[in-house]
């Protein structure tokens, strides 16, 4: 808690994947963890009760979410690969309007080469195939959104990849 408070009003988060720390201020006076409920009510000193981990938004504001793979080889040795289609496997849940996510394909020409954003495409609930263009020896895929009330679950990342010669 802060120096002027007798109750918890600060938080510290360490993100192991991104190797960074986050700090902030959020007063909490009680926490009820029933063990069988998926809703976690939390009391505050301002006489509000919050339900944590409910919905897809941040108290009425859009909450950004993303999933990003590590680099993976798309072709062995000296050969490049050409990625020409993305076949999305994504389920939108509890979303309002026309939900969508953005797929970004990042490529490298070599293991120590610069990571380049090669192709970006938007995928909605009715998208069956997205035609894209990306070329490299290694690829990384990022799926993200920052829309209000947009819940989604990612399945397999399916790409149409062809051998594309040397350079």
Model-identified regions with their sequence ranges:
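Beta-sheet repeat architectures centered on beta-propellers
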Residues: 1-167
């Amino acid at each position: 808690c802060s120096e002027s408070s007798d109750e918890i009003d600060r938080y510290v988060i360490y993100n192991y994947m991104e190797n960074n720390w986050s700090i902030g201020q959020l007063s909490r006076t009680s926490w009820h963890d029933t063990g069988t409920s998926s809703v976690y009510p939390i009391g505050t000193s301002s006489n509000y009760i919050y339900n944590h981990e409910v919905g897809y938004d941040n108290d009425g504001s859009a909450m950004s979410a993303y999933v990003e793979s590590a680099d993976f080889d798309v072709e062995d040795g000296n050969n490049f690969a050409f990625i020409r289609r993305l076949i999305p496997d994504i389920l939108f849940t509890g979303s309002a309007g026309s939900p969508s996510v953005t797929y970004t394909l990042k490529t490298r020409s070599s293991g120590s080469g610069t990571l380049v954003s090669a192709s970006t495409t938007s995928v909605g609930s009715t998208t069956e195939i997205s035609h894209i263009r990306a070329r490299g020896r290694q690829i990384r895929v990022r799926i993200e959104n920052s829309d209000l009330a947009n819940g989604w679950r990612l399945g397999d990342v399916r790409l149409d990849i062809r051998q594309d010669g040397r350079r």
